[in-house]
Amino acid sequence: MTPPHNYLAVIKVVGIGGGGVNAVNRMIEQGLKGVEFIAINTDAQALLMSDADVKLDVGRDSTRGLGAGADPEVGRKAAEDAKDEIEELLRGADMVFVTAGEGGGTGTGGAPVVASIARKLGALTVGVVTRPFSFEGKRRSNQAENGIAALRESCDTLIVIPNDRLLQMGDAAVSLMDAFRSADEVLLNGVQGITDLITTPGLINVDFADVKGIMSGAGTALMGIGSARGEGRSLKAAEIAINSPLLEASMEGAQGVLMSIAGGSDLGLFEINEAASLVQDAAHPDANIIFGTVIDDSLGDEVRVTVIAAGFDVSGPGRKPVMGETGGAHRIESAKAGKLTSTLFEPVDAVSVPLHTNGATLSIGGDDDDVDVPPFMRR
């Protein structure tokens, strides 16, 4: 008699570098379920503090466990030297998330190596990374752009969270920690919004093949997350998701949209239809739109909507945000045949804005690879 097979998708989340390892720690703290966590770093001391299921210190010979010194080449070589070990850790995965803070050493240089290995093994590979603030300096910004370009070539789908957009999320007096916490929630909920669709049963189920159909070889992706309570909650949550200030570039040309609606057992068919219709109205007429629901009674009366748009040209012009009826704006009018009906994701040029830290001191720079920790992870 043959033993029963496990037909559940195997999902692994890899945090590499100071930022990636801290991101994994935060996901574990928040109770992200159904995935295996792997932490990879050149800083052996920082790795000891990780709560990940599996820890791998790389670059033992070249860095002696002291970090990459904010040098991506050191990070790349450290990951290359540990290729066999990384491959063994990723073997058997159906989907691999690679998360890092771009601009430093280990994450910037090592993330493309990890992603390449995962993809070679046949796993659906998704990168989720942060772009540093403009005020962190030109060198770090240039390193981040090079790292993002390399990671884009190595992943099926790459989601970039631009930290400069945090400055648009509140008034001028927003605290440093509140701004970082907002980005933290985007990173966590972005991964969770995808994994929950696969691992959590819902009224409308989405399986791994559906997710793979949207994200395989999709290139750059946009991600939006929204939540709301009370009357019109689903529509409000969808509006927030598709107009998130943490999204960069325009949705024009998107060929695939993945949408998740999470709520309690009282989640109604009418409100699901409202939220899905808003996204459908905003998408390309020929786009492949897949949506599913996740029933989670711990949410109470809250509804969460996650929208991921993939397979589009980020060079297209920006559009004004879509607003539903709850936002007081006009509904989207039908476009001519062959034209986009989307007015999503208006890009905003990065600007230098004074950051009010409420008395906190923020240190930027230096050779310590701790700078690889995304700002929203710094305590």
From Swiss-Prot:
Effect of residue 164 to A: Strong decrease in GTPase activity
Effect ascribed to mutating residue 203 to E: Strong decrease in GTPase activity
A single cellular component GO annotation: cytoplasm
Mutagenesis or variant effect for residue 204 to E: Strong decrease in GTPase activity
Phenotypic consequence of residue 291 to E: Strong decrease in GTPase activity
Effect of residue 135 to E: Strong decrease in GTPase activity
Classification via CDD domains: FtsZ_type1 (cd02201)
Gene3D superfamilies named in the record: Tubulin/FtsZ, C-terminal domain, Tubulin/FtsZ, GTPase domain
Keyword Protease: no
SUPFAM superfamilies the UniProt entry points to: Tubulin C-terminal domain-like, Tubulin nucleotide-binding domain-like
Residue ranges of the region described as Interaction with sepF: 363-379
Family, similarity comment: Belongs to the FtsZ family.
Entry function: Essential cell division protein that forms a contractile ring structure (Z ring) at the future cell division site. The regulation of the ring assembly controls the timing and the location of cell division. One of the functions of the FtsZ ring is to recruit other cell division proteins to the septum to produce a new cell wall between the dividing cells. Binds GTP and shows GTPase activity.
Name of protein: Cell division protein FtsZ
Protein source organism: Mycobacterium tuberculosis (strain ATCC 25618 / H37Rv)
Taxonomic placement: Bacteria, Bacillati, Actinomycetota, Actinomycetes, Mycobacteriales
